[in-house]
Amino acid sequence: MKRVLLPLLLALCLLLTGCGGSTQAAAYTDDAIVARKGDWYTMNDWQHSLSDNTLNCSMKGSTGTLTVWSMDAKADTPVSIDCTLAVTAGRAKLAHIAPDGTVTILLEVSPDAPVTTSTLRFTAQPGENRVKLVMAESTSLDMALSFDQGTLLN
């Protein structure tokens, strides 16, 4: 019995291990994954700091989604983001998730179309609003974000 059980358990472990990255990789092209409450990501190297209401971070070999901001708006509220984003490998985008789950891309960059500095604007709708960083496979980037309202997440 043990001879049969051990190989089956090992096969199950290998199968489950192989499934771990599929959600992260699929998120870049699937708004339904981006809109989910949780985050799914893999990061090989991540350095970050939060000071003076500014999130500074550097990531290498990253894939998936990461919530960087949230706000529970009482009414339609204009929001402004000062953003510096440079991608050296892969692709990255910032997405606003409205309370109804609608995903709006605020900014998308790649090494072919790097963005150094931008001021982004959107309207937070009544309810829970979020902004996520969404990274394609093996993305490396440097980013600084500062929001005029809401809560930056570390």
Which residues are covered by each model-predicted region?
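Positively charged n-region of N-terminal signal peptides that target proteins for export
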Residues: 1-5, 10
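C-terminal motif of bacterial Sec signal peptides marking the signal peptidase cleavage site
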Residues: 14-18
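Transition segment at domain starts
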Residues: 23-71
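Extracellular and analogous surface-interaction loops
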Residues: 68-79, 121-127
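A short beta-strand element within beta-rich, extracytoplasmic domains
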Residues: 77-87
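Short, surface-exposed beta-strand/strand-loop-strand elements in extracellular ectodomains
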Residues: 89-106
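Extracellular carbohydrate recognition and processing domains
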Residues: 105-125
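Edge beta-strands of jelly-roll/beta-sandwich modules across compartments, strongly enriched
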Residues: 133-152
